[in-house]
């Protein structure tokens, strides 16, 4: 299968130093640069539940599971279940809706009041790429960057930046 091929490619990757786990749906390796890479394959109808599970902090996931229990639901990386029946999980929005919440952005999933804010409709606004006015820390070829000053200046102009700081 395609999943098997992708898993094997990770195991065989030239920068893989150590294989921690290797199976049909999950593989974990440590790269030569000491970075751990975890690769999971899930069914399409479980993708949202898996994405939610792996992008939230442990504390956030526990808090969501508590809300689910109040509704006689179980939440895990495979979906939202009522008894043995899967009732949601295709999208992250499904996960939150199943426990009575609006979608919560991954950046907020820390169990630091985001669930309470979501209930009140008071989730904070997050900075978007189009909100950026410039970049104060870029490098050119003259140090350890990959582009010339002119290329960086042109890219900054193309992105609508008002300023660019070359360090």
Question: Language-model segments: which ranges?
Answer:
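An N-terminally biased module of ancient metal coordination in phosphate/nucleic-acid-related enzymes
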Residues: 1-2, 114-167
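Acidic, metal-coordinating catalytic segment for phosphate/diphosphate chemistry
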Residues: 4-130
């Amino acid at each position: 299968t395609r999943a098997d091929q992708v898993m094997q490619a990770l195991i065989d990757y030239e920068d893989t130093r150590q294989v921690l786990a290797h199976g049909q749906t999950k593989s974990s390796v440590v790269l030569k640069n000491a970075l751990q890479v975890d690769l999971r394959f899930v069914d399409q109808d479980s993708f949202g539940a898996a994405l939610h599970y792996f992008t939230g902090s442990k504390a956030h996931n526990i808090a969501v599971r508590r809300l689910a229990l109040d509704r006689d639901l179980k939440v895990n990386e495979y979906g939202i279940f009522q008894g043995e029946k899967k009732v949601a999980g295709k999208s992250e929005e499904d996960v939150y809706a199943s426990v009575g919440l609006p979608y919560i952005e991954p950046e907020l999933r820390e169990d630091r009041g985001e669930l309470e804010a979501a209930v009140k409709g008071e989730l904070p606004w997050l900075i978007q790429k189009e909100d950026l006015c410039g970049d104060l820390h870029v490098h050119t070829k003259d140090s350890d960057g990959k582009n010339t000053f002119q290329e960086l200046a042109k890219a900054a102009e193309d992105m609508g930046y008002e300023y660019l700081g070359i360090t």
